[in-house]
Amino acid sequence: LNGNLIMPGFKDAHTHSAMTFLRSYADDLPLDKWLNEKVFPMEAKLTDNKIYEYSKIAIKEYLTSGITANFDMYISPDPVIQASVDMGFRTVMTGGLNDFTQSVPEIEECYKKYNGYNDLISYELGFHAEYTCSEGLLKDLSALANKLQAPVFCHNSETQKEVAECVKRYGMTPTVYLD
């Protein structure tokens, strides 16, 4: 061990492992255009096998950087979780619930399926962001969170435009609206 350092592994608290293939893809765009015009259309074409393979690539990258656990949000949790299990990697997973790819019953099913599934895996409730979820969807998720006594995770106030548009829609910031 001469000249080396032994320390606990790092934890990455915000990952989207399956999105490794999008690194540097149209990254000169503002977030809303990048998501709506580039990311969401590309993700719609992904198969579970591709999501699994991209997640394995991400996990290999995490490990080479000293990251031994992550908190991952993705719309297709099954292949991400399988990649984590197959790689022996600790993952806290949350779904990317939104109005166009997932439903509250699917999130509940994942919560029940993956908590206790494997010692390396846990699943938390989550949604993508205020601007991709209707009020009704958020209320349904809130009811589920209360039923399960579980926390809820999301992206919040990532850009000035997001905050301004939420204030325009609801007369309050995303943080106040989501409270």
Task: Put a short name on every predicted segment.
Residues 1-7:
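Histidine-rich, glycine-flanked metal-binding segment
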Residues 6, 23-88, 108-117:
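Alpha-helical scaffold segments that flank or form the walls of functional sites
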Residues 8-20, 151-160:
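Histidine-centered catalytic micro-motifs
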